[in-house]
Amino acid sequence: MNFFGIGLPEMLVILAIALLVFGPKKLPEIGRSLGKALRGFQDASREFESEIKREIDRTPATPAEATVEPPVLDSAPTEAVTVEKQTETQV
C-alpha cells in the first residue's frame, strides 16, 4: 500500500506519533476534519476542471484567415517608357 509516496511502515509510525501527541479521544475528530478538508479540495478541483472544459466548449474556434488574392491585370500599361542611355559625363 502506497499512499502519497508513504508506505505502510511509515504510515504506522506517523499514526503512532499522532496517537501520542493528540490522544485517542482527539484523533477521530482530527480525522473527520481532515477528511472534510480533502473532500472540499477535491470538489473545488472538479468544479474548476468542469468550468474550464465548459469555457473551452463554449468559445468558438477562430476562423481561418481569409486569403486575399491581388487583382489580375488584363493588359500591360499603355504608356511607353523610353530609356536613354547616358554616359558618365552627361550624368
UniProtKB/Swiss-Prot annotation:
One Gene Ontology cellular component: TAT protein transport complex
Record-level GO BP terms: protein transport by the Tat complex
One example GO MF annotation: protein transmembrane transporter activity
Annotated stretches, region: Disordered: 57-91
Location (main, coarse): membrane
Chain's role: Part of the twin-arginine translocation (Tat) system that transports large folded proteins containing a characteristic twin-arginine motif in their signal peptide across membranes. TatA could form the protein-conducting channel of the Tat system.
Record HAMAP family: TatA_E
Quaternary structure and partners: Forms a complex with TatC.
UniProt family annotation: Belongs to the TatA/E family.
Designated name of the protein: Sec-independent protein translocase protein TatA
GN (gene name): tatA
